[in-house]
C-alpha cells in the first residue's frame, strides 16, 4: 500500500514536470510565431525587395540553433508522452490529444512542408537572383506562417486549459 502511494506520487511529479515543460515549449513557440506575425513581418514588409531577401536569409540562418530546436521540435517527443501519461483522465487526455494534433498538423507539418521549402529555395539564391522574391516567397511564406501561428496559439490555449479543468 505504501509503495503504491510512493509510485503514484513519483508518477504525478513526473507528469507535472512534463506538463509544465510542454506548456513552456508550446507557449514559447506560439509566442515566437505570434511576435513574428505582429512585429517582425510588418517591419520586414517596409524593406526593399533586396533588403527583405537579405534579412530573411539571415533570420533563416540564425534561427537554426539548439535552443530553437529544443523549444520548437521538443514537443514532437514531449507532447505524445504527455498525452500517453494523461490516458487515465478522460478530460485531460482529450485536451492533450487535441493540443498535440493541432501542434503536429498546424505547426510542425506546415513548417516542414510549406515554410522550410521556401526557406531552402531562398537560401540557394545569390544576391543577383532575389528579384520577385515578394511574389514567390513573401506572400506564400506569410500565408502559411499565419496559419501555423493560429494553430500554435490554439494548441497552447487548449493545453493551458488543462490547468483549469
What are these regions (language model features)?
Residues 1-12:
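Short, Lys/Arg-enriched N-terminal segments with co-localized hydrophobic residues
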Residues 14-27, 91-105:
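Interfacial segments of alpha-helical transmembrane regions
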Residues 16-18, 26-73, 119-139:
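Interfacial loop at the N-terminal end of multi-pass membrane proteins
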Residues 25-28, 78, 102-103, 151, ...:
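Hydrophobic residues within membrane-embedded alpha-helical segments of Major Facilitator Superfamily
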Residues 38-40, 56, 75-89, 114:
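Membrane-helix exit/interface motif
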Residues 71-82, 148-156:
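Core segments of transmembrane alpha-helices
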Residues 104-113:
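Mid-bilayer segments of alpha-helical transmembrane spans in multi-pass integral membrane proteins
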Residues 160-165:
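Juxtamembrane boundary at the C-terminal end of a transmembrane helix
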